[in-house]
């Protein structure tokens, strides 16, 4: 049985939206570089220099003899760095990077990025830029099927998204608990509804996604479980949720991310499940990569957040992350 509880909009009305990146072009049709700064926190961190950087741009042919052919729109998550430089100067250096892109495959299709340009202001992000990085292609590229193998490719940075990490403490991405199941437990999930205003202008390139007025995604927070064999009632779980004093915001981790902060009292069991942290981050890059790509340059705002209380999936139910399901005869083996 599923029970749904609506949060009051005051829980996200301050930081629950992201401004769009409106594409503008030069006279020759090239996109004008832009930077967007997002601050989803409450501003209680003493040192305000920590930030997460996310680059957006065009994957194009690296041909010095003619105008480059744009293949797809792509992104490069650089991660967290510490810098006092102005966003505009960081953007300028990013647009001067010579980032090579290569298409390859592992468990799934991958994109390999590595930079050949010396770093100055972007030195805090040298781990990704100088040693190279490999990403799931569908997470960082709008149309990986259009990227050729016989023509050298480069990633030309056009947009930069900076997320200031102004909350005190650590940001937890509770990956270990997302598949946790327990007997006689109630799963606490969130259903988030976003209103989307897609940024489309004269600089529009390959993009197969369609404009959606609203979109939803779901995240798992944790489980409410009693020590005995009984199960908590939905009303009791709702009371525990209300006591948590949850505040929501949108950030730019991995593209678009949901940030949650508990300002109230959290149950000891749930607090332990979340690594004893009260500041959580759920990147859409991991949760819903298709929606995340749609939101790369879009204006979006939270219009509804609902707590969804469901019975925890029984432990005997197997989770199949692969399309191959072994039969009892062992006729199909996975190496």
UniProtKB/Swiss-Prot annotation:
Molecular function (Gene Ontology), one example: lipid binding
GO biological process annotation, one example: virion assembly
Record bears the keyword Membrane: yes
Keyword Membrane belongs to the record: yes
Annotated Gene Ontology cellular component terms: host cell plasma membrane; membrane; viral envelope; viral nucleocapsid
Family: Belongs to the morbillivirus/respirovirus/rubulavirus M protein family.
Job of this protein: The M protein has a crucial role in virus assembly and interacts with the RNP complex as well as with the viral membrane. Associates with phosphatidylserine (PS) and phosphatidylinositol 4,5-bisphosphate (PIP2) at the plasma membrane. Interaction with PIP2 triggers matrix protein lattice polymerization. Matrix proteins induce host membrane deformation and curvature necessary for virion assembly/budding.
Subunit record text: Homodimer. Dimerization is critical for virion formation. Interacts with host ANP32B.
UniProt-recorded name of the protein: Matrix protein
Name of encoding gene: M
């Amino acid at each position: 049985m599923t029970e749904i509880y609506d949060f009051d909009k005051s829980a996200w009305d301050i930081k629950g939206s992201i401004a769009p990146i409106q594409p503008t072009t030069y006279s020759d049709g090239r996109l004008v570089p832009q930077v967007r700064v997002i601050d989803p926190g409450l501003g209680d961190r003493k040192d305000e220099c920590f930030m997460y950087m996310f680059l957006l741009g065009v994957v194009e042919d690296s041909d010095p003899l003619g105008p480059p052919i744009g293949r797809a729109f792509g992104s490069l998550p650089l991660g967290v760095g510490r810098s006092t430089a102005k966003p505009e100067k960081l953007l300028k250096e990013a647009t001067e990077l010579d980032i090579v892109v290569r298409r390859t495959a592992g468990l799934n299709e991958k994109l390999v990025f590595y930079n050949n340009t010396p770093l100055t202001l972007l030195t805090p992000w040298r781990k990704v830029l100088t040693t190279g990085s490999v990403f799931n292609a569908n997470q960082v590229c709008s149309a990986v099927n259009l990227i050729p193998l016989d023509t050298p490719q480069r990633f030309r940075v056009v947009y930069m998204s900076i997320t200031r990490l102004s909350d005190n403490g650590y940001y937890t991405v509770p990956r270990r608990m997302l598949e946790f199941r327990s007997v006689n437990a109630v799963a606490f999930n969130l259903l988030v509804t976003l209103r989307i205003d897609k940024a489309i202008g004269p600089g529009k390139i390959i993009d197969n996604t369609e404009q959606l007025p609203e979109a939803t995604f779901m995240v798992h927070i944790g489980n409410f479980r009693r020590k005995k064999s009984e199960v908590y009632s939905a009303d009791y779980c709702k009371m525990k949720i209300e006591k948590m004093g949850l505040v929501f915001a949108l950030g730019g981790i991995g593209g678009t991310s949901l940030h949650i902060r508990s300002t109230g009292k959290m149950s000891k069991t749930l607090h332990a499940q979340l690594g004893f942290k009260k500041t959580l981050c759920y990147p859409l890059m991991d949760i819903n990569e298709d929606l995340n790509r749609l939101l790369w340059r879009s204006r979006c705002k939270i219009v509804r957040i609902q707590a969804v209380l469901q019975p925890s999936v029984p432990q005997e139910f197997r989770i199949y992350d692969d399309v191959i399901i072994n039969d009892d005869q062992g006729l199909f083996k996975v190496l």
